[in-house]
């Protein structure tokens, strides 16, 4: 930077003077040289002050030959810059603590939540675990899940509830504790390809129960309840058909073994117990005394017990027909006819009585011939005798009019 410098005084030639003796002598001029050094020092101090003022923060204005210039122009003119500011601008930022923690965190395992749950269940000797046991196995086996425990625990719970390959098992009596057990469905053993937990086949779906299939009950049910639970009882008074196994749900087993014992090596008595079946059993038990699963070979197979609208009709007249439940029916060899028989069962082939379908509660009463092919609906559980006539030992006078008609003692002209 060119700054105006003060003019130096011209040095005067040394004059020779003669002393008193007449000899020429030189005069010492050291005082002039000291003045020049002081001027140079003052210029250096002024220059340093100017540079310090130009480097102060904010917009500075410097006087340069009477012209006001901003600080940026002064610095861009080639002036020296502060080395401390240069170091802060181009210094590398320090590494954050979060980045260092991420570098030390273990990698996430390449397994899905279904694979992790399957690993936990299979390593257990009883092949079943609670939710807390599954989470404890995963966090102990894979360090990645130790720090994010609350987040992935919810994912484990959702996968257990939403996937059909996992079955909830209630706790057995006498084994207190918190939470239910979770196990694998027997049909989902080959869920993973070649036993590798990295590759899973298509989503497993549990087989829906067919109409003729039966759920295995942990406790034996009465005969009436078993008949009510069967959606298709088949012949009304015939022998109950054996339960048909669900196709694909259970493996083939030897005869005489319980099907629910094959679901797992340990007892799973409450695996497929349906609460809705037991909830509807008391309501259906009212009509259980109307039909008993006893063999009745002489009856037509077309007679099927209706537990719908016709069952409600039976309950209406149950009090009036209570005394008729023990009567025997006149069978072969008897030519008598029963008057005023109200049809409740479906119409067999060749019957003359017809049933209206316009939401009527009962059928049209018409006389029907008495034979073994169409027994009275209220006596479905009685055996048909081969004798010509069997009458009740009690006197018929004590019976209501309808009962006397059933016994064949009323007049033909009178209709009950």
Curated annotation (Swiss-Prot):
Pfam (any one): Forkhead
Keyword Lyase annotated: no
GO CC list: chromatin; nucleus
Bias type Basic and acidic residues, positions: 1-29
SMART domains given in the database record: FH
Record GO biological process: anatomical structure morphogenesis; cell differentiation; regulation of transcription by RNA polymerase II
Organism (species): Homo sapiens (Human)
DNA-binding region: 108-202
Main location class: nucleus
UniProt keyword annotations, A-Z: DNA-binding, Nucleus, Transcription, Transcription regulation
GO molecular function, one term: DNA-binding transcription factor activity, RNA polymerase II-specific
Comp. bias regions, Acidic residues: 30-45
Protein name stated in the entry: Forkhead box protein D4-like 4
Renumbered residue ranges of the record's region Disordered: 1-55, 70-105
PROSITE patterns: FORK_HEAD_1 (PS00657), FORK_HEAD_2 (PS00658), FORK_HEAD_3 (PS50039)
InterPro entries membership: Fork_head_dom, FOX_domain-containing, TF_fork_head_CS_1, TF_fork_head_CS_2, WH-like_DNA-bd_sf, WH_DNA-bd_sf
Subcellular location: Nucleus
Oxidoreductase in keyword set: no
Gene name, Swiss-Prot/TrEMBL: FOXD4L4
């Amino acid at each position: 930077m060119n700054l105006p410098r003060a003019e130096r005084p011209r040095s005067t030639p040394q004059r020779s003077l003669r002393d008193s003796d007449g000899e020429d002598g030189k005069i010492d001029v050291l005082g002039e040289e000291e003045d020049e050094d002081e001027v140079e020092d003052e210029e250096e101090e002024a220059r340093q002050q100017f540079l310090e003022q130009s480097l102060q923060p904010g917009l500075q204005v410097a006087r340069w030959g009477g012209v006001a210039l901003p600080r940026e122009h002064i610095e861009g003119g080639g002036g020296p810059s502060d080395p401390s500011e240069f170091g802060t601008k181009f210094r590398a930022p320090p590494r954050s603590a979060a980045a260092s923690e991420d570098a030390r965190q273990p990698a996430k395992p390449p397994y899905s939540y279904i694979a992790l749950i399957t690993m936990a269940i299979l390593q257990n000797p009883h092949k079943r675990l609670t939710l807390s046991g599954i989470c404890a196995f995963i966090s102990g086996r894979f360090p990645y899940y130790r720090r994010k425990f609350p987040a992935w625990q919810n994912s484990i719970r959702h996968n257990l509830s939403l996937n059909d390959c996992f079955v909830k098992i209630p706790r057995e009596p006498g084994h207190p504790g918190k939470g239910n057990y979770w196990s694998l469905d027997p049909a989902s053993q080959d869920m993973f390809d070649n036993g590798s937990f990295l590759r899973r086949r298509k989503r497993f779906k549990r087989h829906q129960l067919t109409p003729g299939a039966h759920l295995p009950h942990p406790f034996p049910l009465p005969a009436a309840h078993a008949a009510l639970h069967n959606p298709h009882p088949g012949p009304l008074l015939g022998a109950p058909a054996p339960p048909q196994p669900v196709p694909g749900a259970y493996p083939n087993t030897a005869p005489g073994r319980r099907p629910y014992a094959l679901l797992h090596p340990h007892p799973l008595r409450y695996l497929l117990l349906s609460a809705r079946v037991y909830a509807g059993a008391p309501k259906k038990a009212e009509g259980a005394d109307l039909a008993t699963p006893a063999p009745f070979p002489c009856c037509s197979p077309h007679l099927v017990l209706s537990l719908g609208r016709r069952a409600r009709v039976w309950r209406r007249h149950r009090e009036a027909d209570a005394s008729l439940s023990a009567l025997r029916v006149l069978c072969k060899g008897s030519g008598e006819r029963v008057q005023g028989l109200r049809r409740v069962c479906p119409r067999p082939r060749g019957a003359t009585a017809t049933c209206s379908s316009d939401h009527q509660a009962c059928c049209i009463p018409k006389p029907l011939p008495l034979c073994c092919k169409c027994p009275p609906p209220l006596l479905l559980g009685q055996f048909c005798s081969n004798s010509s006539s069997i009458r009740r030992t009690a006197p018929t006078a004590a019976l209501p009019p309808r009962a006397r008609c059933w016994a064949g003692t009323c007049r033909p002209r009178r209709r009950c």
